[in-house]
């Protein structure tokens, strides 16, 4: 910490600006990192940010994303990064080093141990991109105990109240994000012209130095930021690009040359604009009174799960959304507007006694909650309609969404068509391939709706969420992110649940009307968990009702090709929320698999995580094979073609029904219809035909 303070003191005495340089550890090769660190110092870097690679860097642009991907392929983990710092120190590195990255690898390593080991390795502090302020107070205290700095981030969107709080927990400097959006720079794009105003606003609350990053690539841009009043200039993406452009053996020299050029090392001292570094001292200290600025108006956690683990740029947008949702759900006129759309969405959905399925099971009555009969073919329309009304309340004109199976994409594009809003759907390239029908449906809904395939990672739902969040942070002023499942940072899990809980409310009323009782068991498939939390929520206080969530077991949970997050995962942080996730020992998110695109996700809603840990709900797995058996069973016994997602719940529901007496009642949420999956199954069936003893002629299917 003291070394960082000393840098800024020396620069102030020289009327100069500190150069803060970022690189990703292990990029492009593991053995390049130490020479690159030394080259940064030789080229004029006063402080170095060393990036800890993460599988899902939602705040970063394409350049840093690629560097993270390459570094992970080079087996770079937290202990390796610390080892590189030790080696660099031994070889003469004296510049302060800040470890910069995302929270989950730290959480997996152990927060206390991560801080202690960093200090022992020679690091000087941390920048945690997605560590929320509420957590940061405790984290900062632990850092201070090891003489390490905690560097908070402030964005152009940060409110004065939050600036006051964030300034109060800064000890060495504050990282000021110059623009909304992800990391990245261009020599042809000017730095934000509002930067002087942003810096002046922050200086009203702190005397701590301010270092500005995002968007700086050239010496002229460096000087502009310095003249705007910055005490330091952060450059990252441009350095990573220089590394990429270098040939084998040339990386250190390329890095040093660029750093010399941009920092002006070796050139005559440059006089900054008058008044560039004026400061207003502050006596603020971190305390409970200051921290009140970040309190939530709706409960942000379910036990230990939930929260807002997001980049600073998103915090105020989430607060705006939370306030709008609270206002809406307390407004009878809002719910009247929602209910007025039931004739459009075909609510209430029917509760159907599956007599043939019941007879097949030979046990409890099997009831199907027919969400598949909703407009657009699934439960997703419930949430889409609710959120589109929220978006209109806060004046958004552009809607983005992620989708896996495509059902949420279709529902979102549908409501955008109805309300005349622009619509962009992010979908993993693999899901685009296996859900081609839904892609066509989305794009058929009008010129304002289109699908953007995502080619990163496993090219599935997780990666679509990453890209949607990057879009949102870049376009907050006009855009609402219409999250499709009960995932993501607060208040998204609560919002989605509130618009899906109609499922359980209707089940309770409908079964009481025909049976005069509560169901004994309710069953729903679980990916992110929207249809399941909608089914379960109204029954949580009813202890006599067993709640069963069915996860995607893929090819079996004895291997890694599954999506059984609650059954096989561990608590961690992904996509802005603390919940159960599928991760390796280093805290990197692992690729998942399911025959159903909608369940192919390595996380789950935080309320499900709480229901699991509290014992209120049971979560089991259903393999691809058994899901196909469930699909076939319902199709041939009842003449109802279910979505592959719902087929997981069908299989488990019938299995449970077999174990119960005939006077019991089990309700299965049939979350969607299977039209979208028919082509995929026709392609898969030859592989499964003998194992399932299911031979269907495909002569009627046109060849491609």
UniProtKB/Swiss-Prot annotation:
Q: Which residues form the active site?
A: 49 (proton acceptor), 60 (proton acceptor)
Task: State the UniProt keywords alphabetically.
Answer: Amino-acid biosynthesis, Aromatic amino acid biosynthesis, Lyase, Pyridoxal phosphate, Tryptophan biosynthesis
The prosthetic group or cofactor this protein requires is: pyridoxal 5'-phosphate
Q: Which gene encodes it?
A: TRP-1
| Classification via InterPro entries | Aldolase_TIM (IPR013785), RibuloseP-bd_barrel (IPR011060), Trp_synth_b_CS (IPR006653), Trp_synth_beta (IPR006654), Trp_synth_beta/beta-like (IPR023026), Trp_synthase_alpha_AS (IPR018204), Trp_synthase_suA (IPR002028), TrpB-like_PALP (IPR001926)
Name assigned to this protein: Tryptophan synthase
Domain of life, source organism: Eukaryota
Q: Does the keyword Amino-acid biosynthesis apply?
A: yes
Q: Region annotation Tryptophan synthase alpha chain: residue ranges?
A: 1-292
GO molecular function annotation: tryptophan synthase activity
Q: Where is the signal peptide?
A: none
Residues modified as N6-(pyridoxal phosphate)lysine are 380
The catalytic activity of this protein is classed by the Enzyme Commission as 4.2.1.20
Family matches, as Pfam families: PALP (PF00291), Trp_syntA (PF00290)
The species is Coprinopsis cinerea (strain Okayama-7 / 130 / ATCC MYA-4618 / FGSC 9003)
Catalytic activity entry: (1S,2R)-1-C-(indol-3-yl)glycerol 3-phosphate + L-serine = D-glyceraldehyde 3-phosphate + L-tryptophan + H2O
Q: Where is this region: Tryptophan synthase beta chain?
A: 293-704
Q: Give the family, as the similarity comment puts it.
A: In the N-terminal section; belongs to the TrpA family.
Q: Which GO terms describe its cellular component?
A: cytoplasm
Q: In which pathway does it act?
A: Amino-acid biosynthesis; L-tryptophan biosynthesis; L-tryptophan from chorismate: step 5/5
HAMAP family registered for this protein in UniProt: Trp_synth_alpha, Trp_synth_beta
Q: What class of enzyme is it?
A: lyase
């Amino acid at each position: 910490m003291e070394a960082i303070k000393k840098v800024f003191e020396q620069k102030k005495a020289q009327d100069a600006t500190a150069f803060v340089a970022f690189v990703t550890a292990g990029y492009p090769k593991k053995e390049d990192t130490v020479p690159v660190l030394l080259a940064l110092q030789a080229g004029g870097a006063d402080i170095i940010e060393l990036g800890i690679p993460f599988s899902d860097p939602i705040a970063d642009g394409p350049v840093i994303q690629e560097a993270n991907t390459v570094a992970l392929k080079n087996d770079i983990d937290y202990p390796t990064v610390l080892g590189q710092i030790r080696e660099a120190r031994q070889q003469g590195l004296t510049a302060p080093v800040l470890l910069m990255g995302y929270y989950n690898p730290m959480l997996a390593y152990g927060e206390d141990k991560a801080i202690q080991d960093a200090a022992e390795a020679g690091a000087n502090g941390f920048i945690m991109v997605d560590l929320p302020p509420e957590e940061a107070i405790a984290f900062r205290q632990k850092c201070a105990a090891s003489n390490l700095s905690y560097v908070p981030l402030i964005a152009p969107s940060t409110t004065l109240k939050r600036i006051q709080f964030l300034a109060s927990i800064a000890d060495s400097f504050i990282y000021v994000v110059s623009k909304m959006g992800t990391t990245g720079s261009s020599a042809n794009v000017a730095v934000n012209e509002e930067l002087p105003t942003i810096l002046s606003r922050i200086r009203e609350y702190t005397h701590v130095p301010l270092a500005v990053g995002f968007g700086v690539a050239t010496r002229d841009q460096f000087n502009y930021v310095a003249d705007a009043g910055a005490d330091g200039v952060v450059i990252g993406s441009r350095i990573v690009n220089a590394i990429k452009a270098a040939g084998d053996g040339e990386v250190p020299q390329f890095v040093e040359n660029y750093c010399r050029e941009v920092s002006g090392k070796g050139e005559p001292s440059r006089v900054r604009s008058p008044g560039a570094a004026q400061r207003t001292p502050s006596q603020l200290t971190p305390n409970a009174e200051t921290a009140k600025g970040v309190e939530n108006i709706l409960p942000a956690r379910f036990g230990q799960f939930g929260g807002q683990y997001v980049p600073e740029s998103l915090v105020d947008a989430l607060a705006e959304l939370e306030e709008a949702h609270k206002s809406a759900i307390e407004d009878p006129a809002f719910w009247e507007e929602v209910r007025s759309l039931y004739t459009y969405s075909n609510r209430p959905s029917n509760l159907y006694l599956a007599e043939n399925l019941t007879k097949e099971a030979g046990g409890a009555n099997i009831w199907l909650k027919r969400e598949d009969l909703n407009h657009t073919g699934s439960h997703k329309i419930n949430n889409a309609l609710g959120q589109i009304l929220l978006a209109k309340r806060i004046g958004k004109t552009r809607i983005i969404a992620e989708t896996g199976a495509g059902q949420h994409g279709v529902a979102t594009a549908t409501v955008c068509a109805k309300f005349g809003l622009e619509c962009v759907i992010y979908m993993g390239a693999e899901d685009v391939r296996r859900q081609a029908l839904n892609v066509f449906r989305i794009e058929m809904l009008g010129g304002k709706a289109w699908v953007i395939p995502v080619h990163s990672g496993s090219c599935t739902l997780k990666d679509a969420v990453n890209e949607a969040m990057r879009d949102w942070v870049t376009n907050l002023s006009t855009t609402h992110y219409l999250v499709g499942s009960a995932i993501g940072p607060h208040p998204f899990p609560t919002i989605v649940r509130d618009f899906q809980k109609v499922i359980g409310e209707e089940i309770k009323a409908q079964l009481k009307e025909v049976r005069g009782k509560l169901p004994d068991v309710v069953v729903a498939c679980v990916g992110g968990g929207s249809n399941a939390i909608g089914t379960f929520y109204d029954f949580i206080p009813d202890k006599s009702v067993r709640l069963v969530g069915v996860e995607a077991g893929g090819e079996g949970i004895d291997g890694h090709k599954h999506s059984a997050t609650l059954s096989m995962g561990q608590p961690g942080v992904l996509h802005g929320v603390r919940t159960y996730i599928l991760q390796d020992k280093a805290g990197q998110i692992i690729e998942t698999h399911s025959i159903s695109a909608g369940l192919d996700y390595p996380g789950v809603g935080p309320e499900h995580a709480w229901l699991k840990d509290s014992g209120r709900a049971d979560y089991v797995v259903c393999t691809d094979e058994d899901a196909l058996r469930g699909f076939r069973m319902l199709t041939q016994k009842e003449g109802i073609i279910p979505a592959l997602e719902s087929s997981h719940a069908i299989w488990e529901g019938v299995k449970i029904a077999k174990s119960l007496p005939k006077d019991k009642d089990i309700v299965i949420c049939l979350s969607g219809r299977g039209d979208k999956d028919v082509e995929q199954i026709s392609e898969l069936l030859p592989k499964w035909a003998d194992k399932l003893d299911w031979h269907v002629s495909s002569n009627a299917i046109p060849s491609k």
